[in-house]
């Protein structure tokens, strides 16, 4: 496969520049016959989850295609689902550059992007143009300059605008790169947010005559008590699924490596065990009451199987896709 050569060239570039260059090329071929260049035939392995039928259990995690610019090209690679975003009500530039770093030896990434995106209206226009026939998830967050106390309003604005176009909606309250965001994972703040989101979901269901499931994305850095509390809240509010996990602030497995001290969330292989353990504990706590989408450090068939054995119904990749390329999709879907 050609990807090792492509990766070698891309890894000569700054990580964000490499991402921009790749997306530039994908945008050029999206919706054209040249999409065949990235198309892969993968076996159909349908999974029913959250009331939806996924073509296969492997999805693309949020963060790669923040604005939904390359849905069709990414879909051609064989993903059973694609989660675009995180998107916010208003466009925002994100944090200052550099803000994305490779830990090549560990096959990890550290990012402090800060929800850079062109806003929810732009994303909706991109989604309208796409022809992807898999499940499209849309991951939503709050603008950096929205006070945390008013954060729920941003989620409700996004829900209203994307509801008609989303297969499912992911609520991102676990990015470490938006000040105060993770506080929405706890106690009254979480209950308040989930109550508002569930009420909005019911209103939108009545308006659009369709039910769009809601999944909440959680952090891997939760304590045992926090995890129990989160699980309890998700069940009480009849949330449809949970995505475990986002990136970690823990650097214990990458000490001494180049870029290890950069501020931000760590993803990729160093996150693998930590996220799997959260899934295992969450699965015990939930006891089948809602499905888990497992994400964090999946870079092989074995790693994907571990997530499913721990209790995940579906899995997602991001950093592993950067390091291994499209062949990883086919490999996982074929052998999972």
Curated annotation (Swiss-Prot):
It catalyses: (S)-dihydroorotate + a quinone = orotate + a quinol. Pathway: Pyrimidine metabolism; UMP biosynthesis via de novo pathway; orotate from (S)-dihydroorotate (quinone route): step 1/1. Keywords: Cell membrane, Flavoprotein, FMN, Membrane, Oxidoreductase, Pyrimidine biosynthesis. FMN binds at residues 62-66, 86, 139, 172, 217, 245, 268, 297, 318-319. One of its GO terms (molecular function) is dihydroorotate dehydrogenase (quinone) activity. GO terms for biological process: 'de novo' pyrimidine nucleobase biosynthetic process; 'de novo' UMP biosynthetic process. Its EC number is 1.3.5.2. It is found in: Cell membrane. Substrate binds at residues 66, 111-115, 172, 177, 246-247. The active site is at 175 (nucleophile). Its main location: membrane. Its cofactor is FMN. Catalyzes the conversion of dihydroorotate to orotate with quinone as electron acceptor. NCBIfam families: PRK05286.1-1, PRK05286.1-2, PRK05286.1-4, PRK05286.2-5, pyrD_sub2. Belongs to the dihydroorotate dehydrogenase family. Type 2 subfamily. Monomer. This is Dihydroorotate dehydrogenase (quinone).
């Amino acid at each position: 496969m050609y990807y090792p050569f492509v990766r070698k060239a891309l890894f000569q570039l700054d990580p964000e520049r490499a991402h921009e260059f790749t997306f530039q090329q994908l945008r050029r071929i999206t919706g054209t016959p040249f999409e065949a260049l990235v198309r892969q035939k993968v076996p159909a392995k349908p999974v029913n989850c959250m009331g939806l039928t996924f073509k296969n259990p492997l999805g693309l995690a949020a963060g790669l295609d923040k604005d939904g610019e390359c849905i069709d090209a990414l879909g051609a690679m064989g993903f059973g689902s694609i989660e675009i975003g995180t998107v916010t009500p208003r466009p925002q530039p994100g944090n200052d550059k550099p803000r994305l770093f490779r830990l090549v030896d560990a096959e990890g990434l550290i990012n402090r992007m800060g929800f850079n995106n062109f806003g929810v209206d732009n994303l909706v226009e991109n989604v309208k143009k796409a022809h992807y026939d898999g499940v499209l998830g849309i991951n939503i967050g709050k603008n950096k300059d929205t006070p945390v106390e008013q954060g729920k309003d941003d989620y409700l604005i996004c829900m209203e605008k994307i509801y008609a176009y989303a297969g499912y909606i992911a609520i991102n309250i676990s990015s470490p790169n938006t000040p105060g965001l993770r506080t929405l994972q706890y106690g009254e703040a979480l209950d308040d947010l989930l109550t508002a989101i569930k009420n909005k979901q019911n209103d939108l269901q009545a308006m659009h005559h369709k039910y769009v499931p809601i999944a909440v994305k959680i952090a891997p850095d939760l304590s045992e008590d926090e995890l129990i509390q989160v699980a309890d809240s998700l069940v009480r509010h009849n949330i449809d699924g949970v995505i475990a996990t986002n990136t970690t602030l823990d650097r214990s497995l990458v000490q001494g490596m180049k870029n290890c001290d950069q501020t931000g969330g760590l993803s990729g292989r160093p996150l693998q065990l930590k996220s799997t353990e959260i899934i295992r504990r969450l699965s015990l706590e939930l006891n089948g009451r809602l499905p888990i989408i497992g994400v964090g450090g999946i870079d092989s068939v074995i790693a994907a199987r571990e997530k499913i054995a721990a209790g995940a119904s579906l899995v997602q990749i991001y950093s592993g896709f950067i390091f291994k390329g499209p062949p990883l999709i086919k490999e996982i879907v074929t052998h999972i």
